[in-house]
């Protein structure tokens, strides 16, 4: 987001889903070893991308397959969509979920608190603070009940919910951001037919999220965010997670 804003002076609105599972990460954690040449300002080392065989061969393979199947050109809305070939079902979701062994509940220490806050400040709040003329629409997506089971199994469920509270509270200090929470869509979240794995949901849910934001439904404010946190805490700390695997 920060780089997009730096490279595009005319951007006036950002819509961003917050990956909840990243809130407990170290502030400088990276999901993999990223190619730095894609993110620096050196044009010359971009040859590493331009002349990379995967850059040419992988898209070529998919484009040829697309042509052989006589598909029409894609629109902006579906050119990068993978949902057409995805399977959304409880069976598929559970087949992709490796349930961790049950661990004792982790202690919430000052060190953990400080690490979470540093992550929130650096990777979420800073961009909002530094761009007061940009309207930010941030949302917590309705991750499946398998995701919540994973946090419960790892003993970090309560810490996860506290991290979400901290993030919401930090963002509410700024007038140029609206934050929406959809972790309380319990009927949707417990219906694994909406998912292909613990995190990825169908495009129908994507559409609903955009509609909810447009309607200002699920918006969290200083007046209601504690009620939201209490509701998800009550639900996920008392849920019978063994039900997921029965039937």
Q: Could you tell me what each predicted segment is?
A:
Residues 28-35, 152-156, 195-196:
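Short secondary-structure boundary/capping segments
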Residues 120-128, 134-137, 199-201, 205-206:
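Conserved catalytic-core segments centered on acid/base and nucleophilic motifs
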Residues 39-78:
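Low-complexity, serine/threonine/proline-enriched polar segments
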Residues 165-247:
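C-terminal regions of proteins
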Residues 55, 119-123, 162, 166, ...:
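Extracytoplasmic/secreted proteins, especially bacterial periplasmic and envelope-associated proteins
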Residues 62-119, 143-158:
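Serine-dependent acyl-ester chemistry module
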Residues 128, 133-136, 140, 144-192:
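Extended hydrophobic/aromatic segments used for targeting, binding, or gating
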Residues 1-50:
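Membrane-embedded segments
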């Amino acid at each position: 987001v920060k780089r997009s804003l730096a490279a595009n002076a005319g951007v006036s609105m950002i819509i961003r889903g917050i990956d909840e599972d990243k809130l407990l990460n170290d502030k400088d954690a990276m999901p993999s070893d990223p190619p730095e040449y894609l993110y620096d300002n050196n044009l010359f080392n971009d040859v590493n991308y331009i002349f990379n065989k995967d850059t040419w061969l992988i898209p070529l393979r998919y484009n040829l397959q697309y042509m052989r199947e006589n598909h029409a050109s894609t629109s902006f809305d579906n050119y990068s969509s993978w949902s057409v070939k995805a399977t959304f079902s409880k069976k598929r979701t559970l087949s992709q979920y490796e349930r961790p062994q049950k661990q004792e509940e982790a202690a919430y220490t000052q060190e953990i608190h400080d690490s979470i806050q540093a992550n929130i400040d650096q990777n979420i709040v800073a961009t909002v603070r530094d761009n007061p003329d940009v309207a930010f629409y941030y949302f917590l997506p309705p991750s499946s009940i398998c995701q919540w089971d994973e946090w419960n199994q790892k003993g970090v469920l309560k810490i996860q919910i506290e991290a979400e509270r901290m993030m919401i509270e930090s963002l509410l200090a700024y007038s140029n951001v609206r934050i929406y929470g959809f972790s309380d869509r319990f009927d949707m979240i417990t219906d694994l037919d909406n998912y292909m794995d613990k995190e990825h949901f169908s495009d129908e849910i994507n559409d609903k999220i955009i509609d909810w934001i447009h309607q200002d439904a699920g918006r969290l404010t200083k007046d209601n965010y504690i009620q939201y946190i209490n509701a998800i805490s009550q639900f996920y700390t008392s849920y019978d997670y063994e039900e997921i695997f029965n039937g």
